[in-house]
Every structure is written in C-alpha cells, then in structure tokens.
Amino acid sequence: MLHLFKTLSVQRSGWLLLLISALALEGTALYFQYGMGLQPCVMCIYERVALFGIAFAGIIGLIAPRFLIMRVLALIVAFLSAVKGLFISIKHVDYQLHPAPWNQCSYLPEFPQTLPLDKWFPVLFHPTGSCSDAVWSWLGLSMAQWIVVIFAVYLLIFLFVLISQFKRVEIHQSRRLFK
C-alpha cells in the first residue's frame, strides 16, 4: 500500500487528483450556498480556507512532484491544512450539537489585516449564517459532520503519503519517444 502512495506522490496524476477533489468540494460548497440557498457561517468559511490550502498543496505538488523539496513542501501544506480543517470542523460540530448563548462563533471572520479574504473575495468568504444551525443532512450526518469525515480522510491519506516518502521504491518510467 505504501508503494501506491509513494508512486502517486511522485507523479502529477496524484497531485492533480488532490487538486480536483479539493476544488470539487469547494464547488459543492458554492452550490449549497448559491444553488440551494444555504448560508455559510464563519466556521464554514474557515473550512473553505482549509480546503483551499489543500488545493494549493495540490498545485505545489503539480509543479515538480519528482523533486523532494517540492513534494515535501506540498505534503506539509496539505497536512497542516487538513489538521487545521479537522480541528475547525470538530469545533463546528460542537457548536451544532451543544448550542448555547455562550458557545457561539462570531459573525465576522477574523482574518489577518494583511489577508482580508472576506473583503477581497466576498463571493467565497463572506459569512451570512449561524454556526449552530444544521439545516442540511445526509445519511444522518450534518454537513459539518461530513466535513469532519472528509478532513479525517484527507489527514489519513496525507499521513500514509508522508510515511511512504521514507520507503525506497523503484519508479518504472514508461517508454518515451524522446529522452
């Protein structure tokens, strides 16, 4: 199994798959917001930022997956984004399962002054909903609970890919017309 993760990590197809999966989740979030009329909360916006971090890691990995430095940089960005996204989504689930006046998220995102994403890209990062509202569910899980599952799966995959980097594997190249 580590062989598969190592092989995918040194090929562009693995990083492209990561990029496409993160962008598909972002597209799904935008569909829920603009197509179905669900309002994102501050925690939803923070989870989007974490997903964009994973997509950015996919772009870094696409640039030069055979170079160890680029691959490790992409893995670090992906791993940290998945960890942060997992912690944020767990807190989001806590807001939904234990709503109370003293256990609420803020209504305005707290981005750094040098990177006010909610001002620069309000279509993507402007929150309008409440964190304690669970207005959508599928198979008995709310959207925030599904995001916990998604970030946990991403984290496990990145952990396996990171461990696989220490395994020596022969990567067989396909025959090329030109060298």
Regions found by a protein language model. Give the residues of each.
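Structural signal for the C-terminal ends of transmembrane alpha-helices
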Residues: 59-67, 159-166
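Short, Lys/Arg-rich, polar N-terminal cytosolic tail immediately upstream
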Residues: 1-9
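Extracytosolic (periplasmic/ER-lumenal) interhelical loops and adjacent juxtamembrane/interface segments
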Residues: 96-142
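Interfacial segments of alpha-helical transmembrane regions
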Residues: 9-19, 66-86, 156
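Non-cytosolic membrane-interface motifs at loop->transmembrane helix junctions
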Residues: 38-48, 74, 103-106
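A hydrophobic membrane-anchoring alpha-helix module
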Residues: 125-179
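C-terminal TM-helix exit segments that contain a strictly Trp-centered aromatic cap at the helix terminus
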Residues: 28-33, 83-99, 117
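Immediate flanking context of iron-sulfur cluster ligation sites
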Residues: 20-39, 58-61, 123
